[in-house]
Amino acid sequence: MQSPHISVLLDEVLDAFHGLSGTFIDCTLGYGGHSGALLEQNKNLRLIACDKDDEAIEFSKKRLENFGDRVKIYKSDFSQLIKVLSTDELKNVRGILADIGVSSLQLDKNERGFSINSDTLDMRMDRACEFSAADVINSYSQQNLAEIFSKYGELSNAKALAAKIVSARNLKKITSAKELASIIGTGRVNGRSVSPAILAFQAIRVEVNDELGELNRLLESIKSANLKECKVAIISFHSLEDRIVKNTFKSWAQSCICPPNAMRCKCGNDHAIGKILTKKAIVASQKEIAANPRSSSAKMRVFEIKGR
């Protein structure tokens, strides 16, 4: 079944989980590209997966139906999936993958409102939720807009952009992504490779879907699950996400948690739950980037949980 979305770092994901048996959790099922390839590669693997996009779930159910009872799919926020699994399900988990990105289909579909060319202003991953990008743009204070542009878009002119948006919406409600992009400006500035509109849209999307909160909650739920002999791979697409993953994995590998200025260890020096398998983030090859330019910002980090 042909997927409308190209899975990033697919070969690298297959390498990371080669020879895996037991249960595999795909926290971001999407259109089933990673999961389908892993099930095909690893014949003794069972899949538990989730997504919150109804369209993606329905597509993946059909795509993966030939794997029969090896597949179980939930509609859920990825941060909640591990919490709802039974003890029996968790004890056999040997791999976890989360691809923290927007699918190509979501970006390209006009009605989803993710693109700067969209006629809508939506950006919801889960369309059952009421809160959308239009609510952020038309109801947030100027200060709050500036804060999310600065924090999530890392825009140096966040205050100026927020002021432009508030001035525009005072004349009339902003209802489309195209309109918002024209207000912000789509030209590249200060030598940056992307326009302020792209970065601002990223910030709005992160806010609408609480993406960083979701990622933090997912990582905490993984640690709290007391897993053993389990590989965890996280694919992220911008520096804020990658920083969270990098720092979390570093903390998981830290045996001593005494203060840096402590003269001697008093914590027992046994707090590490595993080891980092990727000293540097894995990135897409030039061949993959040529075939799928959206993969250029993807970074994957892998951690092996040994348990304590």
From Swiss-Prot:
Pfam families: Methyltransf_5. Its main location: cytoplasm. InterPro entries: RsmH (IPR002903), SAM-dep_MeTrfase_MraW_recog (IPR023397), SAM-dependent_MTases_sf (IPR029063). GO terms for molecular function: rRNA (cytosine-N4-)-methyltransferase activity. Its EC number is 2.1.1.199. SUPFAM superfamilies: Putative methyltransferase TM0872, insert domain (SSF81799), S-adenosyl-L-methionine-dependent methyltransferases (SSF53335). Signal peptide: none annotated. It catalyses: cytidine(1402) in 16S rRNA + S-adenosyl-L-methionine = N(4)-methylcytidine(1402) in 16S rRNA + S-adenosyl-L-homocysteine + H(+). This is Ribosomal RNA small subunit methyltransferase H. It comes from Campylobacter curvus (strain 525.92).
